[in-house]
């Protein structure tokens, strides 16, 4: 089993990355744990072959982003694809911005962008929007876990970024370079660090932040810096992707690890429950720390949810 962390280049779709990974890794069985828009860069976690079975256990992971939000205008797609569709005065200062951001920690619902992959009645929202017949999208549950202002600039500036004990942030000296889309204008721009739950659209966050501040806003740049336990510092350039760059699955899975005896391992491979008093999901390994299965506990026993090994 193999997983790979790739730094998605600007302008490529997530599918473009998957296609290139298939070529470089010599396998058709390649997927990812969560898409990135073409105008976003950063961490795309790829799964291959047997590790594709891990996707249901990884797609709910929290994600960290650094977002560039430009104020005073908006676009149909809510990002820098353009064109500018509406402008509005941005009459607020840094203190107003700092006061608005913590309010997102109480937000529990979000209306997705009209240009999104959500399906309604078998039709993708972005397809309907491009046809001039936008769908009525209702609010969906979201979670904002951390929202932090990193900078407030007179225009989008591609600050370098670096990891820290408190998440990724702007680098004081040398850091990882950032590529932003072509600016749509010299609009005042906030750089915001976000940690969010699954299903959260950062483009919609930009729209909603603008509304909180009495203006229009759009996402002028985005870098994904973490997916669950994997940070952007572990990502390789797509041009450097090779089988040797794999990440061990135990570094990625978010569940407690339970090491089994040989007898217990045999029971797992037969799909039999184990009398181990654990709660929630756990990762089961053998004495050599090889992944055997993922199980779910009810406090009395473990029920096997997915077996990966063929022998113990």
UniProtKB/Swiss-Prot annotation:
<dbReference type="InterPro" id="IPR020103">
    <property type="entry name" value="PsdUridine_synth_cat_dom_sf"/>
</dbReference>
<comment type="similarity">
    <text>Belongs to the pseudouridine synthase TruB family. Type 1 subfamily.</text>
</comment>
<dbReference type="InterPro" id="IPR002501">
    <property type="entry name" value="PsdUridine_synth_N"/>
</dbReference>
<keyword id="KW-0413">Isomerase</keyword>
<comment type="function">
    <text>Responsible for synthesis of pseudouridine from uracil-55 in the psi GC loop of transfer RNAs.</text>
</comment>
<protein>
    <recommendedName>
        <fullName>tRNA pseudouridine synthase B</fullName>
        <ecNumber>5.4.99.25</ecNumber>
    </recommendedName>
</protein>
<feature type="active site" description="Nucleophile">
    <location>
        <position position="37"/>
    </location>
</feature>
<dbReference type="GO" id="GO:1990481">
    <property type="term" value="P:mRNA pseudouridine synthesis"/>
</dbReference>
<dbReference type="GO" id="GO:0003723">
    <property type="term" value="F:RNA binding"/>
</dbReference>
<dbReference type="GO" id="GO:0031119">
    <property type="term" value="P:tRNA pseudouridine synthesis"/>
</dbReference>
<dbReference type="GO" id="GO:0160148">
    <property type="term" value="F:tRNA pseudouridine(55) synthase activity"/>
</dbReference>
<dbReference type="InterPro" id="IPR014780">
    <property type="entry name" value="tRNA_psdUridine_synth_TruB"/>
</dbReference>
<dbReference type="Pfam" id="PF01509">
    <property type="entry name" value="TruB_N"/>
</dbReference>
<keyword id="KW-0819">tRNA processing</keyword>
